[in-house]
Amino acid sequence: MSLLHIAVILPLIFALIIPILYRFFKRIHLGWFVLPVPIVIFIYMLTLIKTTMSGNTVMKTLNWMPHFGMNFDLYLDGLGLLFSLLISGIGSLVVLYSIGYLSKSEQLGNFYCYLLLFMGAMLGVVLSDNVIILYLFWELTSFSSFLLISFWRERQASIYGAQKSLIITVFGGLSLLGGIILLAIPTQSFSIQYMIQHASEIQNSPFFIFAMILIMIGAFTKSAQFPFYIWLPDAMEAPTPVSAYLHSATMVKAGLYLIARMTPIFAASQGWVWTVTLVGLITLFWASLNATKQQDLKGILAFSTVSQLGMIMAMLGIGAISYHYQGDDSKIYAAAFTAAIFHLINHATFKGALFMITGAVDHSTGTRDVKKLGGLLTIMPISFTITVITALSMAGVPPFNGFLSKESFLETTFTASQANLFSVDTLGYLFPIIGIVGSVFTFVYSIKFIMHIFFGQYKPEQLPKKAHEVSILMLLSPAILATLVIVLGLFPGILTNSIIEPATSSINHTVIDDVEFHMFHGLTPAFLSTLVIYILGILLIVTFSYWVKLLQRQPGKLTFNYWYNRSANVIPNYSEKMTNSYVTDYSRNNLVIIFGALILLTFVTIFSVPFNINFKDVSPIRIFEVCIVILLLSAAFLILFAKSRLFSIIMLSAVGYAVSVLFIFFKAPDLALTQFVVESISTALFLLCFYHLPNLNRYNEKRSFQLTNALIAGGVGLSVIIIGLIAYGNRHFESISKFYQEHVYDLAHGKNMVNVILVDFRGMDTLFESSVLGIAGLAVYTMIKLRKKRQTQGNEVKNHE
């Protein structure tokens, strides 16, 4: 096993160990045991920077099911390294922050188990080269995030948010599964790199459009893009460390990673360019607009996260235009990939810090309601300093890193407006217009975020707690991120050659080796747009109290949340009615549906799929075998029209004993003896059970009822015969019986092949089957004993009375 595999598996292993440690070390905060895990992974990933800088990659394989092309293949290039550093780096800071945020009285064993489970799943997503393995980790992120969001399960809002996120992201996961299966059909491979190398085969496939749509849905749901964004604001009910980790730097970035990774395959389609770009821009505009009217600090950051994800998504879509050009023109559009990567890093720094400060404010005051907050400037000066730095970066104000990536974003939108896709030139001007409007509202909610907390009147009477500055443990992580905001703003070259260029080259076929970010490029359209954004933003802040009321009057039926909630109520009701229509307490009706579906499926398959039935090697039929079969069929037929229970039991036993005789003729005495014993015991049990049932010596059934039973029974029997004959005549693999014939004597040292298979080759199966029977017996014994105990207690009460 390689170190890369260990890096992915390590958090998963510790996720199993941590709950055990929690039981023995309750006096020590469990976070200290967890902290080394992401730190070690982060340090290991740092050692791989030189590898990706030189243009090399790391490919490691761990065999799983090689015959089916499914192995635990890991592939690390510049893009995978970038996300791995974010996952482990931000993860380290979040764990450190959580030590100060969560008290020892919380269920820390559960919390850190879920967190490590999520961390390992995210590393698996960004490093997997096998799409099936990627999908498994993808769904594991949804499952673990569900557990994290619902950590405070006593709160109804937490349960609602967790269910909402799970439903939407799992829906996207199923779409992703469909998309990757369609990708694997033309390439006959599950390897992402192989698919990229053979992208032309996929593009010529009739499944190309469907695969593209399904994969985009999977990415849009995960990254909370319009209209699937509604799960993210409700997920803010999770503890703040979860919000800082999942919803700023990791989980919501998984969709962006998927779009970036699949761009070489789908970028040739103009539909990919337009859809990814417009969905990103619409998300940017809609979420930034909604962020301005939120009354909860986390609500502001939730919609802020959605809008920033939309910005990055739009840049990835614009960058895909480079696949439609050659030479220098291609490099011009490929610069959007560079801007997307840079802003992805910047967003993780300032948004992670802002979430942590929000948690600090909530921890200090007991509320996140902006109506109750204000005037905390002198009470929480360190938190104020960190907030100003990171919020101004989010607003796109120099000299912070957010300004550089925002300028790059505006430049890419102006560049995209000149692209002649679909021969609709004027439509391209929507890109900079939407980008500027979205940036204006981004500026507004960023500045208002600072004002809501630290300016205005201090209202101690409305605060559940007395406000105070939080501990150093809660300030250290956001302070580190705020420092990165300043450093990356002043010295962006630190990342260009080491991180950004290798990540960009993983997405784009055009090599860009002159990446530079500057505070001032001259009087460019992007710089002039920035001035317009500042002016309009300040005007909107001054008039905020007037126009924000219009946004808050938005009719409920026009929101996606309304339709989600309505669907969540209506669908279960209709599902229950539909289920009750065919699932009843009468087991016979349930069996009719199950067996009827089997019969239908069998005959539909027979008439739609070519097959071969081979009677060449069938053994000859002897006269006594025919007699036994006739006896067996006669007994089975009589069961259908029996008039008494006793007669049904006798005929059912006759069927079983006839099968035992057939086993003897087929030279399987062990099976015959087993069948004989089972039939004898079953018959005795049936008779004992019916003795205690109501005295119904005779019962009449309608002729149609009996005929239905006969048709179902005959259809099932015929289906099994046909399936058996088809399986016998269409063998795609060599029979395993030869293996047993060769090794049953020399390896197992046995003479009876059936016995050896049961107790040796399949010994574990037999052991667990015996265990199941034993547990069932204990359960029956316990129920009988409890019944006797209750009867005894009841008699004692009566005697006492």
Swiss-Prot record:
UniProt topology in membrane: Multi-pass membrane protein
One Gene Ontology cellular component annotation held by this UniProt entry: plasma membrane
Name of the encoding gene: mnhA1
Keywords from the named record: Antiport, Cell membrane, Hydrogen ion transport, Ion transport, Membrane, Sodium, Sodium transport, Transmembrane, Transmembrane helix, Transport
Keyword flag Cell membrane: yes
UniProt-annotated location(s): Cell membrane
Subunit and interaction comment: May form a heterooligomeric complex that consists of seven subunits: mnhA1, mnhB1, mnhC1, mnhD1, mnhE1, mnhF1 and mnhG1.
Recorded family membership: Belongs to the CPA3 antiporters (TC 2.A.63) subunit A family.
PANTHER family (UniProt xref): NA(+)/H(+) ANTIPORTER SUBUNIT, NA(+)_H(+) ANTIPORTER SUBUNIT A
Stated name of the protein: Na(+)/H(+) antiporter subunit A1
Transferase as UniProt keyword: no
Species, as recorded: Staphylococcus aureus (strain Mu50 / ATCC 700699)
Entry's transmembrane regions: 4-25, 30-49, 79-101, 108-127, 131-153, 166-188, 208-230, 243-265, 270-289, 302-324, 339-361, 373-395, 429-451, 472-494, 526-548, 589-611, 621-641, 646-668, 672-694, 707-729, 767-784
BP GO annotations: proton transmembrane transport; sodium ion transport
Free-text function comment from the UniProt entry: Mnh complex is a Na(+)/H(+) antiporter involved in Na(+) excretion.
InterPro entries, alphabetized: CPA3_Na-H_Antiporter_A (IPR050616), MrpA/MnhA1/PhaAB (IPR005663), MrpA_C/MbhD (IPR025383), MrpA_C/MbhE (IPR046806), ND/Mrp_TM (IPR001750), Proton_antipo_N (IPR001516)
Listed GO MF terms: antiporter activity
